[in-house]
């Protein structure tokens, strides 16, 4: 499943870039797709990356509400940008992508935190996404 792992990493990078630039993630996604088509050195943006980014974008407000509600002692603005965007991606895939097992989502997001964030972040990511997983049936409302 290396392709899915890469797709998640690229989706995270797109969400991160959008957050850093204050740009809409769909605009950033379109930029990535356009760039990958015009520069043969860039790998194409996979369908799954597009699905993740577009899915998050369609539920961004609800996802941010959930993260804010269940992150103890952290507001979205105070969270490290990396953690905030790993949580956004993880919350979307956990709650709305039924084809991916919950344990896989948690593991993949923890791995992203290990690669891109602080030493404390993997436990924070795992704890918050684990809580969302427990409450999943009641959280899927639109």
UniProtKB/Swiss-Prot annotation:
Tell me the Gene Ontology biological-process terms attached to this UniProt entry: DNA-templated transcription termination; transcription antitermination
Looking up Pfam families in the UniProt record yields: NusB
Q: From which domain of life does this come?
A: Bacteria
MF term (GO), any: RNA binding
Spell out the InterPro entries in the cross-references: NusB-like_sf, NusB_fam, NusB_RsmB_TIM44
Keywords assigned by UniProt, alphabetized? RNA-binding, Transcription, Transcription antitermination, Transcription regulation
| Signal peptide annotation | none
Q: Name one GO cellular component term.
A: cytosol
Keyword RNA-binding annotated: yes
Q: What is the annotated role of this protein in its UniProt record? A: Involved in transcription antitermination. Required for transcription of ribosomal RNA (rRNA) genes. Binds specifically to the boxA antiterminator sequence of the ribosomal RNA (rrn) operons.
UniProt name for this protein: Transcription antitermination protein NusB
Native source species: Streptomyces coelicolor (strain ATCC BAA-471 / A3(2) / M145)
């Amino acid at each position: 499943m290396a392709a899915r792992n890469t797709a998640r990493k690229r989706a995270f990078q797109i969400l991160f870039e959008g957050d850093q630039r204050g740009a809409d993630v769909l605009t950033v996604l379109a930029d990535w797709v356009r760039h990958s088509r015009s520069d043969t050195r860039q790998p194409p943006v996979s369908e799954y990356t597009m699905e993740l980014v577009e899915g998050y974008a369609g539920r961004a407000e609800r996802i941010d509400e959930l993260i804010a509600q269940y992150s103890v002692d952290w507001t979205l603005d105070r969270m490290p940008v990396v953690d905030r965007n790993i949580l956004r991606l993880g919350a979307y895939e956990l709650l709305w992508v039924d084809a991916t097992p919950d344990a896989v989502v948690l593991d993949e997001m923890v791995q992203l935190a290990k690669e891109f964030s602080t030493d404390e972040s993997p436990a924070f990511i795992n704890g918050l996404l684990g809580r969302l997983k427990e409450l999943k049936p009641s959280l899927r409302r639109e």
